[in-house]
C-alpha cells in the first residue's frame, strides 16, 4: 500500500507542467531513468502509450498475453503474446540491408502492425503482415489505414489473417521479420518455410531480421542461412521506458543468391534467467 501511495504521489508531481518539462527532457531522462527508482518517474515496459504511436495516431502499445487473444489453445500455448517493436532496433536493422526496393517485407506474427509501419518508411515493393489472432489483425489493419491516410506516398500495408507456421511466401526477394513472436517449436516451422522458399527459387535473395532472438538457435541451425549482423541496439532516448529494457539484440541472417557477408556476426547470444530476453555475451543484461 505504501509503495502504491508513493508511486501515485510521484506520478502526480511529475505531471505538473514545469516539472514534467524538465523530467521528460531527453538529456535529463537519459540520466534519471536507468537509476534505481527511475521507473517511478517514467513507468515501465509496454503498457504506456508509445511516442511513435501518439505521433502517428495509432494504437499499437501494450502487452497482450496469448490467453487474452482469440486463438485456439494449440497456438496459445506456444505463442509469446503481443508487444510492439521498438522503432530504433527495426530501423538499425533495415538500414543495414541493401537494395530494399527489390524486396518484399513480411512480418511473421505482426500483431498490431507497428513494425510494418516502421518498415513503410523504406522503399519495399510490398509490405505484408501475417497474424493468427483476428483481434490483433483487425487493429493492425486500422493502424495501417491511418498510416496510409497520413503517408499516401508509402508502400501500402496488407495484413493476412493466417498461420505463420504454414505460410507460403510468394516469388521474389524477401525480408522476413520477427519480434520474438512464438516459442522455438513454431519458429522452427517458419525456418522450414523460409528454406522451402529458397529451394523453390535459387535466384531469390532472402534476409531474416529477428529482434530479441530468443530462438536464435533455430536459424543458426539452418544450412540455408548464414548470419550477417548481430548487434545490441540501444533504444533512442524517447523510447526508453516504453519497452522491456534499454536496448535490444538484433540478429540478421541471409540466404539464397546473396554474396557472402563481409563482416563476422558470430557473437554468442545469451538469455536472462527466465529466457524471455536475448543479449550478446559481452553485454551485461539490464
Language model: regions and residue ranges:
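S-adenosyl-L-methionine
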Residues: 2-101, 137-172
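Conserved class I S-adenosyl-L-methionine
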Residues: 102-111
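Glycine-rich SAM-binding Motif I of class I
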Residues: 113-117
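A short SAM/SAH-binding and catalytic strip from SAM-dependent methyltransferases
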Residues: 173-187
Amino acid at each position: 500500500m505504501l509503495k502504491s501511495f508513493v508511486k501515485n504521489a510521484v506520478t502526480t508531481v511529475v505531471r505538473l507542467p514545469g516539472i514534467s518539462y524538465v523530467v521528460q527532457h531527453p538529456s535529463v531522462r537519459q540520466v534519471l531513468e536507468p537509476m534505481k527508482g527511475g521507473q517511478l518517474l517514467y513507468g515501465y515496459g509496454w503498457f504506456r502509450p508509445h511516442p511513435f504511436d501518439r505521433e502517428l495516431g495509432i494504437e499499437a502499445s501494450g502487452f497482450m498475453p496469448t490467453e487474452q487473444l482469440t486463438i485456439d489453445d494449440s497456438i496459445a500455448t506456444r505463442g509469446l503474446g503481443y508487444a510492439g517493436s521498438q522503432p530504433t532496433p527495426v530501423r538499425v536493422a533495415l538500414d543495414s540491408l541493401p537494395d530494399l526496393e527489390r524486396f518484399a517485407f513480411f512480418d511473421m506474427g505482426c500483431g498490431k502492425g507497428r513494425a510494418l509501419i516502421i518498415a513503410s518508411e523504406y522503399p519495399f515493393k510490398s509490405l505484408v503482415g501475417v497474424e493468427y489472432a483476428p483481434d490483433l489483425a483487425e487493429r493492425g489493419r486500422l493502424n495501417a489505414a491511418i498510416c496510409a491516410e497520413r503517408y499516401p506516398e508509402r508502400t501500402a500495408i496488407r495484413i493476412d489473417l493466417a498461420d505463420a507456421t504454414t505460410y507460403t511466401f510468394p516469388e521474389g526477394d524477401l525480408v522476413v521479420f520477427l519480434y520474438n513472436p512464438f516459442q522455438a517449436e513454431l519458429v522452427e516451422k517458419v525456418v522450414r518455410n523460409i528454406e522451402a522458399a529458397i529451394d523453390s527459387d535459387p535466384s531469390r535473395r532472402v534476409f531474416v531480421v529477428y529482434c530479441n532472438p530468443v530462438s536464435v538457435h533455430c536459424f543458426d541451425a539452418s544450412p540455408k542461412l548464414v548470419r550477417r549482423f548481430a548487434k545490441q541496439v540501444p533504444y533512442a532516448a524517447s523510447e526508453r521506458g516504453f519497452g522491456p529494457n534499454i536496448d535490444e539484440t538484433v540478429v540478421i541472417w541471409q540466404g539464397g543468391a546473396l554474396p557472402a557477408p563481409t563482416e563476422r556476426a558470430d557473437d554468442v547470444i545469451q538469455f536472462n534467467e527466465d529466457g524471455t530476453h536475448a543479449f550478446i555475451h559481452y553485454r551485461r543484461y539490464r
